[in-house]
């Protein structure tokens, strides 16, 4: 093996490796074999300077290309010494990685590992040259899927599956409009204020004001009108005792029932579009959600801003946007990108789990082919991040989107 023939993306320099193919300095496996390595002997000063100034990964294209290969300058004794490449926005390693759902085609045996269908995901990166999103090379995709990404994506899929089950188990439809309008509007009197159960609104927990207005449920529980009406718009039960009002008539006029969870084709395109996954400097991953509203014919997709990407949380700058490159998919590891309904329909079934239980995302649930039913649900959109590796417990944190 030629000395110094491997480039470490973590240390941003050429290194000698053992048979285990790992960097002897950072013990990382993010290495690339350079076919024509520079023949030099690194000095102690070079090692120290490089290690301290280039801890952050280097972005594609790899160092073997002319744009990012560390050039050699000649000393008086004609011995080549490396020229340190300044870390810029255009030469960092692919971070974040854009993850989209892959093709629904049956996977081949060589893309399935440890129970995860690797063809179920498409991975892209922005090379920082305004050329748009590019599919990750096959070798890099295989590396990421073998370094914790597979467990991370598998865990995300399990969360999505559990969330969909919870949506399907929701048995409380909205209250009917006539039942809501029939709720009496009463005036708060001293007897209400003396009662433990009627002195305050059970939704906002605030005490009623004498001679103010309140809505009274058939179960005699009373609420502020501004509190109970939004509640009854999403479920027909009393927040305290679960007494149920008549439910909304979920029919479309032709006898075909509408389930409590559906979306039209336009709402599907407004749902979650995908994920942005960052590798954190201290290890592990951070996951951000690409906001909805993306259309199949659009050339642009929004990308979340974080400290890892050079911005500060709370910064007033607009989120950075990246465009799809002219090269799409193929055999470069990302799969083909279709325009129009095919690709849009595929990405609309992406990670609907990235929202809290109190929240509202236009869930992209496919309509049942035989029943003619349509599903409709809204929950508040919220981003979600995983700071530990997929094998550790995840923690929540909002990312700017």
Curated annotation (Swiss-Prot):
<dbReference type="GO" id="GO:0008270">
    <property type="term" value="F:zinc ion binding"/>
</dbReference>
<keyword id="KW-0833">Ubl conjugation pathway</keyword>
<dbReference type="InterPro" id="IPR001841">
    <property type="entry name" value="Znf_RING"/>
</dbReference>
<feature type="compositionally biased region" description="Polar residues">
    <location>
        <begin position="76"/>
        <end position="93"/>
    </location>
</feature>
<dbReference type="Pfam" id="PF13639">
    <property type="entry name" value="zf-RING_2"/>
</dbReference>
<dbReference type="InterPro" id="IPR013083">
    <property type="entry name" value="Znf_RING/FYVE/PHD"/>
</dbReference>
<keyword id="KW-0863">Zinc-finger</keyword>
<dbReference type="GO" id="GO:0016567">
    <property type="term" value="P:protein ubiquitination"/>
</dbReference>
<dbReference type="GO" id="GO:0061630">
    <property type="term" value="F:ubiquitin protein ligase activity"/>
</dbReference>
<dbReference type="InterPro" id="IPR039525">
    <property type="entry name" value="RNF126-like_zinc-ribbon"/>
</dbReference>
<dbReference type="InterPro" id="IPR010543">
    <property type="entry name" value="DUF1117"/>
</dbReference>
<keyword id="KW-0808">Transferase</keyword>
<keyword id="KW-0479">Metal-binding</keyword>
<comment type="pathway">
    <text>Protein modification; protein ubiquitination.</text>
</comment>
<dbReference type="Pfam" id="PF06547">
    <property type="entry name" value="DUF1117"/>
</dbReference>
<dbReference type="Pfam" id="PF14369">
    <property type="entry name" value="Zn_ribbon_19"/>
</dbReference>
<comment type="function">
    <text>Probable E3 ubiquitin-protein ligase that may possess E3 ubiquitin ligase activity in vitro.</text>
</comment>
<feature type="zinc finger region" description="RING-type; atypical">
    <location>
        <begin position="201"/>
        <end position="242"/>
    </location>
</feature>
<keyword id="KW-0862">Zinc</keyword>
<feature type="region of interest" description="Disordered">
    <location>
        <begin position="41"/>
        <end position="93"/>
    </location>
</feature>
<protein>
    <recommendedName>
        <fullName>Probable E3 ubiquitin-protein ligase RHC2A</fullName>
        <ecNumber>2.3.2.27</ecNumber>
    </recommendedName>
</protein>
